[in-house]
């Protein structure tokens, strides 16, 4: 496997110098490029990210309910947020993708970018230890933790349901109208049907749940107009 270029620059951006660069190389390698890809590291990093953010929120909001803490954590560790961090790090410049993913613009795909951030967290853990991961993750999330609040953390589907119930309207209907791609990299197209709108609103994402949330968010925006 060819070495990934400009690794020293990426390490400066991350704020961490790897003892074993092989961990970072693997974290940046998509399954389309090699059998030694980043999915196991992603699994590890996902768990570490969850505990670090959970711990930070628990201490930052001593009076918040379990529901509020869960919603804030979901906001902070969601694919969209992780992809934003990846873009800040310019991770797309360093990813190793197979020819098909390169051609289709995989270095810009939210799910691939988000997975790479989690894989890097897993790689840092294996190269060092949990406390180093904690300090780095908290540094990466510093500005986001400063502005997160327990209020307004309900997801779009919940907000839409509550809005319709308030006005005694029928609940929305979500319908998967199309799926595309291999099992590990599927794209879901979901329609959200609401009585007050003349046509269904469509959401597209890497999972059914995310596609439903995307469609619900669009419906909420339309109902504000």
Swiss-Prot record:
<keyword id="KW-0540">Nuclease</keyword>
<dbReference type="GO" id="GO:0019843">
    <property type="term" value="F:rRNA binding"/>
</dbReference>
<feature type="active site">
    <location>
        <position position="118"/>
    </location>
</feature>
<feature type="domain" description="RNase III">
    <location>
        <begin position="7"/>
        <end position="129"/>
    </location>
</feature>
<dbReference type="InterPro" id="IPR036389">
    <property type="entry name" value="RNase_III_sf"/>
</dbReference>
<keyword id="KW-0694">RNA-binding</keyword>
<keyword id="KW-0699">rRNA-binding</keyword>
<comment type="subunit">
    <text>Homodimer.</text>
</comment>
<dbReference type="Pfam" id="PF14622">
    <property type="entry name" value="Ribonucleas_3_3"/>
</dbReference>
<keyword id="KW-0479">Metal-binding</keyword>
<keyword id="KW-0460">Magnesium</keyword>
<keyword id="KW-0378">Hydrolase</keyword>
<dbReference type="GO" id="GO:0003725">
    <property type="term" value="F:double-stranded RNA binding"/>
</dbReference>
<keyword id="KW-0819">tRNA processing</keyword>
<dbReference type="GO" id="GO:0005737">
    <property type="term" value="C:cytoplasm"/>
</dbReference>
<dbReference type="GO" id="GO:0008033">
    <property type="term" value="P:tRNA processing"/>
</dbReference>
<dbReference type="InterPro" id="IPR011907">
    <property type="entry name" value="RNase_III"/>
</dbReference>
<dbReference type="GO" id="GO:0004525">
    <property type="term" value="F:ribonuclease III activity"/>
</dbReference>
<keyword id="KW-0255">Endonuclease</keyword>
<dbReference type="GO" id="GO:0006364">
    <property type="term" value="P:rRNA processing"/>
</dbReference>
<keyword id="KW-0963">Cytoplasm</keyword>
<dbReference type="InterPro" id="IPR000999">
    <property type="entry name" value="RNase_III_dom"/>
</dbReference>
<keyword id="KW-0698">rRNA processing</keyword>
<comment type="similarity">
    <text>Belongs to the ribonuclease III family.</text>
</comment>
<feature type="active site">
    <location>
        <position position="46"/>
    </location>
</feature>
<feature type="binding site">
    <location>
        <position position="115"/>
    </location>
    <ligand>
        <name>Mg(2+)</name>
    </ligand>
</feature>
<dbReference type="GO" id="GO:0010468">
    <property type="term" value="P:regulation of gene expression"/>
</dbReference>
<keyword id="KW-0507">mRNA processing</keyword>
<protein>
    <recommendedName>
        <fullName>Ribonuclease 3</fullName>
        <ecNumber>3.1.26.3</ecNumber>
    </recommendedName>
</protein>
<feature type="binding site">
    <location>
        <position position="118"/>
    </location>
    <ligand>
        <name>Mg(2+)</name>
    </ligand>
</feature>
<dbReference type="GO" id="GO:0006397">
    <property type="term" value="P:mRNA processing"/>
</dbReference>
<feature type="domain" description="DRBM">
    <location>
        <begin position="155"/>
        <end position="225"/>
    </location>
</feature>
<dbReference type="Pfam" id="PF00035">
    <property type="entry name" value="dsrm"/>
</dbReference>
<comment type="function">
    <text>Digests double-stranded RNA. Involved in the processing of primary rRNA transcript to yield the immediate precursors to the large and small rRNAs (23S and 16S). Processes some mRNAs, and tRNAs when they are encoded in the rRNA operon. Processes pre-crRNA and tracrRNA of type II CRISPR loci if present in the organism.</text>
</comment>
<dbReference type="InterPro" id="IPR014720">
    <property type="entry name" value="dsRBD_dom"/>
</dbReference>
<feature type="binding site">
    <location>
        <position position="42"/>
    </location>
    <ligand>
        <name>Mg(2+)</name>
    </ligand>
</feature>
<dbReference type="GO" id="GO:0046872">
    <property type="term" value="F:metal ion binding"/>
</dbReference>
């Amino acid at each position: 496997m060819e070495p990934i270029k400009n690794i020293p620059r990426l390490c400066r951006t991350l704020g961490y110098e790897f003892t074993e660069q092989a961990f970072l190389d693997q974290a940046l390698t998509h399954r389309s490029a090699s059998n030694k890809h980043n999915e196991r590291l992603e699994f590890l990093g996902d768990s570490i990210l969850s505990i670090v953010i959970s711990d930070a929120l628990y201490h930052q909001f001593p009076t918040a309910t379990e529901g509020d803490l869960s919603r804030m954590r979901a906001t902070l560790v969601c694919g969209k947020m992780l992809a934003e961090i990846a873009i800040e790090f310019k991770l797309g410049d360093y990813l190793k993708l197979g020819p098909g993913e390169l051609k289709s613009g995989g270095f810009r795909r939210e799910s691939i970018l988000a997975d790479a951030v989690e894989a890097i967290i897993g790689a840092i853990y294996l190269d060092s230890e949990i406390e180093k991961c904690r300090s780095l993750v908290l540094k990466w999330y510093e500005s986001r933790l400063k502005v997160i609040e327990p209020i307004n953390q309900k997801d779009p589907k919940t907000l839409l349901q509550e809005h319709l119930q308030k006005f005694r309207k029928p609940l929305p209907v979500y319908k998967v109208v199309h799926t595309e791609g291999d099992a590990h990299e599927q794209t879901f197209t979901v329609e959200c049907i609401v009585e007050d709108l003349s046509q269904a609103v469509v959401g597209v994402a890497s999972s059914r749940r995310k596609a439903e949330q995307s469609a619900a968010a669009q419906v909420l925006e339309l109902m504000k107009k």
